């Protein structure tokens, strides 16, 4: 917890005074003094610290202390999600209003249900009464009953005898009684039907229509009482006329179609189509369904939108926070695609908000639910859903219409920021290297490289090694840590610019990159083969990288690579940001040079350390700060003579597996007892990270191998060269490595067809010569391939050691083959023996 609440403050205290008062124990990121509506102080405030350790120290230091004459109480602040936080008066009133509203809605719903039930019962009874009072309607309802509700053996009469002729009426009709209510026309119809033939069918139809017209009209009038909608007379007439035309055999299909079609003039208006009118019951049901759906709470609406985009908008962040701080915070919930802090382009400072894009949308939802309104670096994070990022890239449909060369160029640009380059960080254009060396020697490039000479490739490799050495020396003098190039983590603010033509000036590079933001540092060695650009802020550097990657520049194409983290060991000087070539050339005369061995960790002292034989003298260092690292302790004792190594004792962290905690003490080893006593007299009582150190001689002796044995263990006078061109010969290796010392042997293994296998072994007489060759030829290209060099194992001194080594090697090869076979067959896994063994002898 990095946020505190301070109670009992004086009324006249302001936020500026609070910030000044509480900054004694750490960096204060936020000060919030609570006030009333009239601006009067409520005598409590919230203080935010950048780290939880600083907040903890502040609680111990300031709690129950005094500000002027007021005694203050300092405690850790609670988050909104803490169940122990009491509700405010506003929140209580809001909940009571919501409860009352829910109760009113429940009562209203019950009333509506009762009315609907009553209305349904009333309408059912009205229909039953109407059927009982109307014989014709009752007969119709009986006839229209489904077959499973009608008894097939029952008489076709109405239950109460009404609605049909009685037995007396039928007898009178058969006897020809004129008083019968049955119309004579009905009898004529029956007789006609019995004696009719097929030719007289039309007459019978006309006769039946005459008797049926009045009945249909009466039935329609009776059915109107059910509330049916009135029919459209015009549509009825049109349908009847269409049916008559269809029944007429003399009308063709085309004439019938014309009669059913409507002609529209060329410039006439299209008649509006009347939408279908829904039933009243259907509309009511749809309305009821929408009312029954539960409304989403504001939190659920935010989570639903986050699930659609997978992007978060976080505000109220600390202005000193970096993208790496939030990357480590949000990466706990899933893989991140982008973390972007909004930067003010005029000042280069944060605007106080950022965007986080997750690869998986569900991870963004989990991060929102976990971190919203939580404390980070002393501030309450407010997380909202962000709109989807605008993508201006071309899709596959647009790309396929472009030429193939343009498609590849655009795809390279899109993948530039994600691709890990295969070349080394100090890659240089071979043509620029030769131009630089030729210019330095005062000869032409053709004179330097003779195309008819078989050793031209070796000369080019040696020239590249010379230029790389000069570049290393230049960068080391400017505070560049070359060992950081081996790190995997990259810094978005640093860009390595490569492959530009020889003769390019620092002004041209600066003008090219300054269009995307303010530059903090520019370095380009006199060889003019590579440059390092550092931007003031990361967004500007990302924009420049995406726009300039693989961009054609003069006669070449720019290769850009993001620089490693912690590349620079110091802040830039005024000369390092200058763009005038004269200042660049005179830089080395102004600045104090730093030894290359110091940057690489191979200083003269290290050479002396390697020569230490036997036990060393250890100094016990007590009362270390738990935050003090080995590097900080080493930096303190390194200037003293005889320093060997410094260590801080640690123990496993029970809360975080894989991490360690400092035990508050350590040891520093020196070569002699006199040098250890000098260190004690010099630094005893020195304050490091806020703690006063206590030094005394340790009763145990140092091993003397903690620093030197690590360096010596992997070194030998034999080097293995990998990624060797197949065209390279033994003569080329003799010329290349012979420039750095006397060679003992050079071996290039070959296949059965006498072709090279792509690696070789070179052995020097002295280990120092092998180290020189390794350092000078690192990153050098031979025939277009970068040489990868490692120290090889020394040859066995006797046959038994050689047999044991070969046995281990064969076991490893057999285990590898078994593992491959098991994977293909799907039988499982075979664990390899994890031992420190070399692939090559």
UniProtKB/Swiss-Prot annotation:
Pfam families in alphabetical order: RRM_1
CDD domains: RRM1_MRD1, RRM3_MRD1
Region listing for Disordered, in residue ranges: 194-249
Biased composition (Acidic residues): 214-223
GO molecular function: RNA binding; rRNA primary transcript binding
GO cellular component, one term: small-subunit processome
Signal sequence interval, chain numbering: none
Subcellular location: Nucleus
A Gene Ontology biological process term: small-subunit processome assembly
Gene3D superfamilies: 3.30.70.330
Coiled coil: none
Keyword vocabulary terms for this entry: Nucleus, Repeat, Ribonucleoprotein, RNA-binding, rRNA processing
Compositional bias ranges of the Basic and acidic residues kind: 202-213
Domain RRM: 2-79, 310-388, 493-565, 617-700, 717-794
Function statement: Involved in pre-rRNA processing.
Family per record: Belongs to the RRM MRD1 family.
Protein name listed in UniProt: Multiple RNA-binding domain-containing protein 1
Lineage per the UniProt record: Eukaryota, Fungi, Dikarya, Ascomycota, Saccharomycotina
Name of the gene encoding the protein in the UniProt record: MRD1
